[in-house]
Amino acid sequence: SADGGLSKRMFGSLLSWMQDHRHPIFLVATANDISALPPELMRKGRFDEVFFVDLPDKEARKHVLKIHLKRRKMNPERFDLNQLADHCEEFSGSELEQVVISAKFAAHQENTPLADKHLIQEMQNTRPLAILSSEKVRQLRQWAADRCVSAD
């Protein structure tokens, strides 16, 4: 394998630890592609529930934008978060972060304060992975609908 077997050894150690550990524990793990995980990791008793976290809805996108604006010392109240959230459907949280970073850079190049127009322009320039890989996202959503608990 590309990692020299590190992943296999790591999963083996995790499975052994989960099997041997007798105290009550609450273990949370995340995966971008659950189909790539070994099936023995997914059986009941190891992970009793699998939750599906979809891309952020409008309210979540507004919240994510607010977080990333604040992190960059911007007052989110200066922006029309409703309008901005309408322009970035199917964006992931990390894609929204990059929109804010790129828009701030573009505004700096113009020697103007960051404004909605900069953010919207960056959103229009961004092709989110969910659009570029729409078939894969559709399949993942279908798989999750049949097998997972919605995290919403």
What are these regions (language model features)?
Residues 1-85, 91:
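Walker A/P-loop NTP-binding motif of AAA+ ATPase domains
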Residues 77-100, 109-152:
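C-terminal engagement/docking regions of AAA+ P-loop ATPases
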Residues 103:
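C-terminal anion-handling pockets and recognition modules
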